[in-house]
Each structure stands twice: as C-alpha cells, then as structure tokens.
Amino acid sequence: QPDFQRCPSLRCCQQLRQAVQLTHQQQGQVGPQQVRQQFQTHQRIPAICNLQPMRQAVQLAHQQQQGQVGPQQVRCCQQLRQAVQSQAAAAGQVGPQQVGHMYR
C-alpha cells in the first residue's frame, strides 16, 4: 500500500485533475455516464484528494517524457493507480472493459 499522506506527487494530482477531465471530455472519450461511474468508484477509495489516479498516472508519464516531473512522482502515482484498480476490481465495481478504458 502506498503512503498517501507522504506521497509528494499528490499535490500535482489536484492540479492535473480538472485539466485531464476536460481534455478527455473535449476529445469525446468520456461521456457523463462514465464520469459519474468513475466518480462513484473513487469516492469509496481512501485517498486524500478526489482525483482520477489512473488517468493522472498516464498524464504524469507523458510529462516525465518531457522532463517536467521526476521518476519518483511517476512511480508514486503508478502505485496509487494500482491500489485504485485492485480495490475497485475487488469490490466488483469496475470490470475489465472499464479498466481498459481508463488506461487510454
């Protein structure tokens, strides 16, 4: 389990959350129903900020390639993403198709 309280990358999660959501909505990749389902899933996850960990980890990976964030931030958000995925799958809230969609 990653230590959510000490994770240095969680500050960037808050900054990226709205930008990533808007980008996906503008590209037509996510409709209102998917946004609502993901929000309900993440509401049940004990994180210190309300975010989209899977999308954010992908966003961080792109930023790392551009030299904007360090590898520790990316690694921490990958741990956060894995924790979210495992908890959501274990609770039966997210099927393989939804998980695959959130990775894109």
Curated annotation (Swiss-Prot):
Gene3D superfamilies: Plant lipid-transfer and hydrophobic proteins. Glycosylated. Keywords: Antimicrobial, Chitin-binding, Fungicide, Glycoprotein. GO terms for cellular component: protein-containing complex. The keyword Magnesium does not apply. SUPFAM superfamilies: Bifunctional inhibitor/lipid-transfer protein/seed storage 2S albumin. GO terms for molecular function: chitin binding; identical protein binding. It comes from the Eukaryota. GO terms for biological process: defense response to fungus; disruption of cellular anatomical structure in another organism; killing of cells of another organism. Chitin-binding protein. Has antifungal activity against C.krusei, C.albicans, C.tropicalis and C.parapsilosis. Inhibits C.albicans by increasing cell membrane permeability and production of reactive oxygen species. Has no hemagglutinating activity. Oligomer in an unreduced state. This is Chitin-binding protein 2. It comes from Moringa oleifera. The lineage of its organism: Eukaryota, Viridiplantae, Streptophyta, Embryophyta, Tracheophyta.
